[in-house]
């Protein structure tokens, strides 16, 4: 699918200048397993809030379905975009270790305030409702700020426990991303079963308080493993990576009128090296920076530019991805959720099937499919990251088509006024396919943005991965607002009417399926021409 760039050292590898390599006493699976447990505790906390957020907004806070969905998407988008700032601070100034500690502290404070806000008596007066909403949204966005530093750094910190220059550890690193996803999904599955039940049947304050304790445990466990990690808090004699890359663009712009011959004469050796690499055949305008910049710096700039088409074409997938915690949940709430007399399945619990399918499929993928594919492809990960991402995007389109068909059937049953509503179990296949899709695309995007950026920018690389989901959530929120306004005119019911039996979520799902197909076609075109930055990139 893509050409491989064979010179790993010029862009840097896991053994970067500010990692402390003590291979016999630190790092490896010993440290990586602890990082997985640390993030499992954090994921329990985050999804203990996020999974049922729309039900809290439409319930105790009294928002409409469309407003609540827009608020959830806006917050989720902010959670996904703030890592760009957190990654920048980590890679440029603080380092990943310090950033994780500081952001975890903010995270814990936000969760504590969130739980406190639910204890404020509501509906007693306008002032008390306003106070509750103010504290609630302030704490919610404080959690987002904590996530902004935590999320890009913890995954990179875990992957950095493996040396990419060692063949065995490079394979272990690829496996690490699979098992990190596995652990996260077990944790998310647990919190969706436990927290959502507590929130809807016992107490919202208790349901939001338990995630606070879980995040406190996450920070404690992370600090417990300090002596076993491969890391250093100091940068060793390297310029700010953002300054290096910015300088390449500035020099290329300054020299844009210089003839090629003058550039070659100015630095003949660097120019010959540039021409020797397949990756340098792309973005040749940056070669004009060779007058005053080093080859490695120019290649770093090109590596960053190559990410942009993949980032853009992956956004449609994340728009589709944004529907499972919002409209899928509201869709399930209108269906027959009884499993025994007096016992209802919380609608948000259905999201557990996404995680359950990942938990079931990842061991099969990592232990059976990868070795089988490796025997044919000779790729240490079985298939390339772009092939993995593309498989997941295709499956997400299939899930959305299935969701549209099920919603059409549900609406027909509701409008026929059947005495027994359609069973909620009809939604399970779309959740399962979404889970398998996430296993391919989410892990693939993590590996891709970790491996294809310069080593000193890996926190930012992971943040770029997360920002795709932010863009998807913001665009989803924008689409919902526009479609709601358009379809609510002239006395017509909105596609997102509060009474979903009179709404048309099926039309929205079909629209997303069409957009997904168009985005997938563009993705295939860019992926086919992509040039990998390293030979050992997953």
From Swiss-Prot:
Keyword set, alphabetical order: Membrane, Phosphoprotein, Transmembrane, Transmembrane helix, Transport
Modified residues (Phosphothreonine): 99
GO cellular component, one term: plant-type vacuole membrane
BP-aspect Gene Ontology terms: nitrate transmembrane transport
Protein name: Protein NRT1/ PTR FAMILY 5.11
The organism of origin for this protein: Arabidopsis thaliana (Mouse-ear cress)
Record carries keyword Zinc: no
GO terms, molecular function: dipeptide transmembrane transporter activity; low-affinity nitrate transmembrane transporter activity; tripeptide transmembrane transporter activity
InterPro entries: MFS_trans_sf, NRT1/PTR, POT_fam, PTR2_symporter_CS
Compartments (UniProt record): Membrane
Membrane topology reported for the UniProt record: Multi-pass membrane protein
Chief site of localization: membrane
Chain ranges passing through the membrane: 44-64, 74-94, 100-120, 134-154, 175-194, 204-224, 308-328, 342-362, 389-409, 424-444, 463-483, 507-527
UniProt xrefs under Pfam families: PTR2 (PF00854)
